[in-house]
Amino acid sequence: MRNDGGFLLWWDGLRSEMQPIHDSQGVFAVLEKEVRRLGFDYYAYGVRHTIPFTRPKTEVHGTYPKAWLERYQMQNYGAVDPAILNGLRSSEMVVWSDSLFDQSRMLWNEARDWGLCVGATLPIRAPNNLLSVLSVARDQQNISSFEREEIRLRLRCMIELLTQKLTDLEHPMLMSNPVCLSHREREILQWTADGKSSGEIAIILSISESTVNFHHKNIQKKFDAPNKTLAAAYAAALGLI
């Protein structure tokens, strides 16, 4: 059973240690130390941007072997990694297993070749609707049921504190080009997402169809989208409508 008093002392100590740090290098150094205290050799902090849908921008920082991180990025494994994809539908920690990687055998086999044999991944939603994940790994000693709850709680605290700290420091991993929509643009996008044509939207909003199309063009430029349908899909994915 977890020692709640010890856990609260640890959490208070971690926040106190992070509070005066003013650079990402110091933040990641504290994270690495805590990961080792938790019994793991490696960590990776990843951020998956929401768009584009087919090849979302994914950035990873951590102590995984450098060659493996480069390979992971080059192969765009972030788009198929089940430990990351789990975070799109759940905020629960996943422990790595053969069954988890059943549809991503090449990724799983390569990771183990690099000594990333035992691990866990925990996701959270970051600002701008980004997905942040914290993974920890070691080369042996399976995660026991006794360890699992302790790992889950500490990873949750670590990733929330880390993400907030990096956001405050405006770290590039967590920065995305903000899309600002006017009230009228948001209205038009909402109706577009509901399948309404420009003519129908014009009638609903009591404006001309040319005005609707004018707003559509401006919206598409803001999202760098080739058509209004994709612009509406991007806006929905980013939580703007």
Curated annotation (Swiss-Prot):
DNA-binding region: 198-217
SMART domains: HTH_LUXR (SM00421)
Ways its activity is controlled: Activated by interaction with the autoinducer signal molecule N-butanoyl-L-homoserine lactone (C4-HSL or BHL), the product of the RhlI synthase. Is also activated by binding to rosmarinic acid (RA), a homoserine lactone mimic produced by plants, which induces a broad quorum sensing response, including the induction of all major quorum sensing controlled virulence factors. Rosmarinic acid secretion may be a plant defense mechanism to stimulate a premature quorum sensing response.
Keywords: Activator, Cytoplasm, DNA-binding, Quorum sensing, Repressor, Transcription, Transcription regulation
GO annotation, cellular component aspect: cytoplasm; protein-DNA complex
Induction: The rhlR promoter region contains four different transcription start sites, two of which are included in the upstream gene (rhlB) coding region. The rhlR gene is subject to a complex transcriptional regulation. Expression is dependent on LasR and on different regulatory proteins such as Vfr and RhlR itself, and also on the alternative sigma factor sigma(54). Expression is partially LasR-independent under certain culture conditions and is strongly influenced by environmental factors.
Function recorded in the entry: Quorum-sensing regulator that controls the expression of multiple virulence factors in response to extracellular signaling molecules called autoinducers. Involved, among others, in the transcriptional regulation of genes that are responsible for rhamnolipid surfactant biosynthesis. Acts by binding to a specific sequence in the rhlAB regulatory region, both in the presence and in the absence of its autoinducer. In the former case it activates transcription of the promoter, whereas in the latter it acts as a transcriptional repressor.
Family listed: Belongs to the autoinducer-regulated transcriptional regulatory protein family.
Record-given protein name: HTH-type quorum-sensing regulator RhlR
High-level lineage: Bacteria, Pseudomonadati, Pseudomonadota, Gammaproteobacteria, Pseudomonadales
